[in-house]
Curated annotation (Swiss-Prot):
The chain crosses the membrane at residues 6-26, 32-52, 67-87, 108-128, 130-150, 174-194, 201-221, 245-265, 282-302, 308-328, 344-364. Belongs to the UPF0718 family. One of its GO terms (cellular component) is plasma membrane. Pfam families: ArsP_1 (PF03773). Its main location: membrane. It is a multi-pass membrane protein. It comes from the Archaea. This is UPF0718 protein MJ0584. The keyword Cell membrane applies. It comes from Methanocaldococcus jannaschii (strain ATCC 43067 / DSM 2661 / JAL-1 / JCM 10045 / NBRC 100440) (Methanococcus jannaschii).
Amino acid sequence: MKMDVMSFIMNIINVMINTIIDYLNVNRVLALLMAFLMAGGIASMINKNFIIKYFGSNTPKYISYTVAAVSGSLLAVCSCTILPLFASIYKRGAGIGPATTFLFSGPAINVLAIFYSAALLGWDIGFLRAVFAVVVSILIGLSMEIIFKSHEKKRALRVPKADKISDRPLYQTITFFALQFIMLLVITASPKLFPTLSMPLYDGFLLKHLLFIILGIILAVTTKIWFKDEEIKNWLRESFTLLKIVFPLLIIGVAIAGAIKAIIPPSYIATYVGGNSITANFIASFIGALMYFATLTEVPIIKALMELGMGVGPAMALLLAGPSLSIPTVLTISKVLGKTKALTYLGLVVIFSTICGYIAGIILR
């Protein structure tokens, strides 16, 4: 009996270690690096008033939520990679509503994932995923703003309008962030959707890695020419500060997610998420909210679960909750927003994903 328990524990530990190793592959480490550098750039280079102008709680909702949803959807990133960017804009004065809309929309309204879902699961599922993801991102943001309205009033800053994104020429700031943004897109590009970028050049060295290096050199040269040494130091300091806060929590969360996968196998999950009951959709949403899905990996996993008997509704619930949330996300959000707001965000993601999954199950049955 003791041997069985020890074997079980050792298996879980082994899975956790392997999950961390798989997580820390070259492409993901580079993607996280770019996310932290972009976040550090937002914190140090962007005029604080400019962020408040478009993301602040006093900004008209049709502007702040549209900007938040669109900004997030342009990033083909997972729930972990979006965290440093979310932490940065919230720290700089973004309202909790637009900030959490941005947090959800990054992984959930991922344009690449939407098309990949359509290609692998069917265009009806892909289309509904896109519609529900936009709606849910805004509903979550509005709900967070309403629930924590009193706290946001205390936090809101009355600042003059900011017409400039920064004190330097606009083209320099745009180039600085555009290069990092393109580097992030290049390194996270799916080989299924962009096979050319994954063309091997030498022993695991791909075309995307060469392009990443070239863009990195251009970024380094332009930054050195345009920015003062003190500005560069502040940028790197802010990036490293975020790295120290977020990265350990990501690793802990990924390990826990790996343990959950070891304890609850997909075939076992599938038996409880067949059909289209509220319970089945809730279970799918809740499990999706705890498990970690790297960018685009949720699609083949859900396809496999559907082949094992998962209903269309629970599959949609998992498509919405899975990529947008995970244990690493919850742990990190609690550090940025506090435990109450983090758990509220978790609850809202699960609730809205459950409802949308149930509706999808009715529409697509």
